[in-house]
A protein has these predicted regions:
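Aromatic-rich juxtamembrane segments at the membrane interface
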Residues: 161-293, 298, 574-577, 600, ...
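Residue-level signal for inorganic ion chemistry
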Residues: 82, 334, 374, 601, ...
Length: 775
């Protein structure tokens, strides 16, 4: 069976996907797969039968996982008996910890708002394991995705068999009774203690990297540095990868042999230590994969198996085993990246990588192979890839593998054994880590190397995979005519084809993005002829005590609007229209300016700009972005699409909401009114100046506040549809019942982001349809 386990792994994958996604396409694919094995691999009937049995086995495993993926806890439950199963995560004044309910045998996520700095310090020192705790709280469903391409937290937790979040008001350890700890709990407690030990005994630069490489925990990392690693495509180095595990195992094995221990003893020792190491490092997919592969190889050596286990067989068996115990993991980005990249490197090693004799060219080829293998998954999950990662990997992989990994283990051992680490070692590592962090942040700002075509659909994913297979085929075929030219052309096609596809898209769209209590509307014209963003949303920041501050507080521009735009493949904003100076409308502009190319900013012509507007002007100046102060009478036309500014008057000196930019747009055969937070006073001025004004779609002013959308205004413009951008359960009571009643009186169809998520109007040659993201 040497070299054939891969065929069973493919059958297992198809079996699970048949259940998890759509049955018919994957069942037909499995049928075709069996035919290809018979036709080209000369599989006998018995072998084909085994592959079919493997497919059916994993089909039923997947079916069982789907059928049991639901909660048994009644939503009215308020009292719970919990065993904490993971390390607590403390971020500012928020504590989160996973637990298992003793009555329902179901996992839950606990959230607790810490009351004081003293309580926070105390909770950091407490053990959450080997105890049964009684807590009272309110069950709530995890958040769902309310915008296209947004992260679906509810689905993410559901695939981990977590269906509820409990909000508790009292200390989670207040009413607990001790229990006998299990071996797994003891190891997890050791991990948590180790992370806390690093945090309290080393500078944060060393502690954060040590926690990541020794224990698989990235919570100590500076969010800006972590983002830089992600943007440059080398964040995998901050996870405990297969390379790290292999190096560590080789190091331990070598040390054992040098100390006179037998090979058999060391193999037995490593077989015992590997499962412990997986738990100690957090059990990420990359660690589990590499540990399983090494475990299988060591096991065959121990049992003196006649057949050598090749790397391809090891990764195939690891994949099958992993999927057997956790079929839901197939959707985990870490799982997909770990197995796909490792598989492609294993397959390419004898055909591609061995053709490079020089170390540096082999490293470059390996880095390129890994980047190409990861490309479809990176684009699907994160919408962007940095080409600079190919070069960065060549510098950072040796640095992490041969300096950081052994060096940080050494620092930890010295500190633990002697209670003190020589200052010279601390100084050296702190300097090197700071320099490497500075370099990665510098490289992350190279937008030229960032490739952002957006999230590919299924058709585009298939095209990507086809092009990649063609690239690898030509690359490994040494006698292929004009090999280098064809490879270069294919790689260029790989990079530009989705952006070309986006440009050919004949559909335009208007999307009211769900940004909570704020406004942000995208206008994207067909064939990429124009991209306009009306407002950016914004997060209100209130001054808090230092200990309450989160490491990376939620910011709607960075966390909602930018991912939405990147998911659409949008990297350039032709006009950023900031209707007025309120934070909930323009606070996210800083993230937009930082992450995307903004060509022009339109702001209202007012006498007294807000502090936020002045800060945006300063940022625009740094980026050489043209800023235009617009007023009544300004307009622009792109093809059949026309935009006319109705308000404010030039050098407006009144109340800020009254001075909002209000304009009419003709888009997709429909007339639109956009007016920011325009109040009734501003509306009255407009209907007096334009007594014949009629619109099809009204963006309701000020989130449906009763200070906007006056009855006289609605009666005159007679909208067929009203869009209200409003936060769910907001403290202002928006939209106001009076406004809703006014709109209903005129038979206006109302769409609300708090209830329906993003609202999109998609149009083609003067006709279109409007649809909410949520049903």
């Amino acid at each position: 069976m040497n070299g054939k386990y891969i065929y069973f792994a493919i059958a297992a994958l198809l079996g699970v996907l048949c259940v998890q996604l759509t049955f018919l396409p994957f069942f037909l694919l499995q049928t075709l797969y069996l035919y290809l094995l018979y036709k080209y691999k000369r599989f006998m009937k018995f072998q084909l039968g085994l592959v079919a049995v493997c497919f059916l086995t994993f089909f039923f495993i997947g079916q069982h996982a789907v059928s049991t993926n639901k909660t048994a806890i009644p939503s009215s439950t308020t009292t719970f008996y919990l065993q904490y199963t993971e390390d607590p995560k403390i971020d500012g004044d928020l504590l989160q910890v996973q637990a298992a309910d003793a009555r329902y045998k179901e996992k839950l996520l606990i959230r607790y708002k810490i009351q004081s700095e003293q309580e926070k310090d105390l909770l950091k020192t407490k053990t959450f394991y080997h105890c049964l705790c009684r807590v009272s709280g309110t069950l709530g469903k995890p958040a769902i995705a309310k915008n296209p391409n947004a992260f679906n937290y509810r689905k993410y937790l559901s695939r981990k068999n977590i269906y509820w979040i409990i909000e508790i008001q009292e200390n989670p350890l207040q009413t607990c009774s001790p229990m006998n700890p299990s071996p797994v709990e003891l190891i997890k407690q050791l991990r948590y203690s180790g992370i806390n030990y690093l945090e309290s005994h080393f500078p944060i630069e060393i502690a954060s990297l040590s926690a990541a490489l020794l224990f698989g925990d990235r919570n100590l990392f500076d969010p800006e540095v972590l983002t830089a690693y992600q943007k440059t495509g080398i964040v995998h180095l901050l996870a405990i990868s297969g390379l790290h595990v292999s190096l560590l195992i080789a190091m331990v094995f070598y040390i054992g042999i040098r100390f006179g221990l037998t090979r058999q003893f060391m193999i037995n020792f490593l077989l015992i230590i590997l499962p412990i190491y997986v738990i100690l490092t957090g059990g990420s997919p990359s660690v589990i994969r590499s540990a399983m592969m090494i475990f299988l190889v060591l096991l065959t050596v121990k049992l003196k198996a006649r057949l050598r286990l090749f790397p391809l067989d090891a990764i195939s068996l690891a994949f099958i085993s992993y999927l057997f115990f956790n079929p839901m993991v197939i959707f985990d980005a870490g799982f997909q990246l770990s197995f796909s990249v490792s598989l492609v490197i294993i397959l390419s090693a004898p055909y591609i990588l061995q053709g490079y004799e020089k170390t540096i060219t082999r490293m470059l080829a390996t880095s390129l192979v890994a980047q190409l293998a990861a490309l479809p998954f990176l684009l699907y999950h994160y919408f962007e890839v940095s080409m600079i990662g190919i070069i960065a990997n060549m510098v950072y992989i040796p640095l992490f593998s041969f300096v950081y990994l052994p060096g940080l283990y050494l620092l930890f051992i010295i500190q633990f054994m002697f209670g003190k680490t020589p200052l010279i070692l601390i100084s050296i590592f702190r300097t090197i880590i700071s320099l490497s962090n500075y370099l990665i942040e510098y490289l992350a700002d190279f937008t030229f190397f960032r490739f952002i075509p957006g999230r590919p659909n299924w058709f585009l994913l298939i095209v990507y995979i086809f092009i990649l297979l063609l690239i690898f085929f030509i690359w490994e075929t040494k006698a292929y005519p004009k090999r280098k030219v064809h490879l270069f052309v294919l790689i260029v096609v790989l990079i530009i084809f989705q952006q070309g596809w986006n440009w050919l898209n004949p559909y335009g769209e208007v999307t009211m993005i769900d940004v909570g209590q704020g406004d942000s509307i995208l206008i994207h014209l067909a064939h990429d002829k124009g991209t306009y963003l009306i407002d950016t949303g914004g997060t209100m920041n209130y001054t808090e005590e230092k200990w309450r501050e989160r490491a990376r507080a939620f910011e709607v521009g960075r966390d909602v609007v930018v991912p939405f735009l990147k998911g659409q493949g949008i990297t350039k904003i032709d006009k950023l229209i900031l209707t007025h100076g309120d934070m909930d409308h323009i606070g996210g502009a800083f993230s937009i300016i930082k992450e995307l190319e903004v060509k022009q900013i339109l702001m209202p012509s007012v006498v007294e700009p807000s502090i936020t507007e002045l800060a945006i002007l300063e940022e625009a100046k740094k980026k050489n972005i043209t800023v235009i102060k617009v007023s009544e009478g300004d307009k622009w036309i792109i093809g059949e699409n026309e935009f006319d500014i109705l308000s404010p008057e030039k050098n407006f000196a009144g109340e800020r909401n009254s001075g909002s930019i209000a304009f009419i747009a003709q888009l997709g055969g429909v007339s639109w009114f956009f007016g920011g937070d325009l109040d009734q006073e501003g509306e009255e001025k407009i209907i007096k100046k334009y007594p014949n004004l009629k619109v099809d779609v009204l963006k309701a002013g000020h989130h449906g506040s009763k200070t906007s959308s006056a009855e006289s205004f609605i009666n005159q413009i007679s909208p067929r549809i009203a869009l209200i951008s409003v936060g769910e359960k907001n403290r202002f009571g928006h939209p106001h019942s009076e406004v809703l009643n006014r709109l209903r009186k005129t038979n206006t169809v109302i769409f609300r982001t708090d209830q329906q998520g993003a609202i999109t109007y998609k149009f083609y040659q003067g006709k279109g349809t409007i649809s909410p993201y949520l049903p």
